[in-house]
């Protein structure tokens, strides 16, 4: 029998262990779960979203406050349970997030695989003028307008601590 996910929603208190297990399974290790723990401890997380399916969480993403530019968010990590990967859940989650960013006027940056995130609405071209401690060639942007801002990105300290 086919199973379909429920609607994306904010993570609820008490779901941290389920998210931790999802991150460890999706990334085959603790690094992304450790990043989320560090972001939570530092107060950098702006929001955590889950994609439930039945009695489990099969998708997750976190948005964190950038140090600079003020008001910008960064997306990391994004995870989908290994047994449901390939069903475009990530693309759907990213599509809804990028639509929200455009409509709300919120800039969001992400570092990762271009084909994955561009399918969801992020743009590498718009990120071309950004300066970053990470490879700009793998940095993408979502948000208002079709501009290509010229700004310097400073990520939450938790990112550098895990390098």
Predicted regions and their residues:
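A conserved beta-turn-beta hairpin within the catalytic core of GNAT-like acetyltransferases
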Residues: 66-75, 85
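Short, solvent-exposed loop/turn elements at beta->coil junctions and helix N-caps
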Residues: 36-41, 128-130
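Conserved active-site alpha-helix within GNAT-family acetyltransferase domains
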Residues: 103-136
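Short, low-complexity Ser/Thr-rich regulatory SLiMs
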Residues: 65-67, 82, 144
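Conserved acetyl-CoA-binding loop-helix of GNAT-fold acetyltransferases
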Residues: 80, 86-99, 110
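Short amphipathic alpha-helix that is part of the acyltransferase structural core
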Residues: 1-35, 44-52, 56-57, 74, ...
């Amino acid at each position: 029998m086919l199973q379909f996910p429920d609607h994306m929603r904010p993570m609820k208190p008490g779901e941290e262990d389920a998210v931790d297990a999802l991150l460890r399974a999706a990334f085959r290790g603790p690094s992304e779960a450790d990043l989320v723990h560090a972001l939570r401890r530092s107060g950098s997380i702006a929001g955590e979203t889950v994609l439930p399916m039945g009695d489990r969480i099969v998708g997750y993403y976190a948005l964190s406050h950038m140090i600079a530019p003020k008001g910008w968010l960064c997306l990391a990590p994004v995870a989908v349970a290994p047994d449901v990967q390939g069903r475009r859940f990530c693309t759907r989650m990213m599509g809804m997030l990028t639509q929200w960013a455009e409509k709300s006027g919120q800039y969001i940056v992400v570092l990762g695989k271009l084909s994955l995130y561009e399918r969801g609405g992020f743009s590498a071209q718009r990120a071309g003028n950004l300066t970053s401690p990470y490879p700009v060639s793998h940095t993408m942007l979502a948000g208002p307008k079709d501009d290509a801002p010229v700004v310097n990105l400073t990520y939450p300290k938790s990112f550098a601590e895990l390098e």
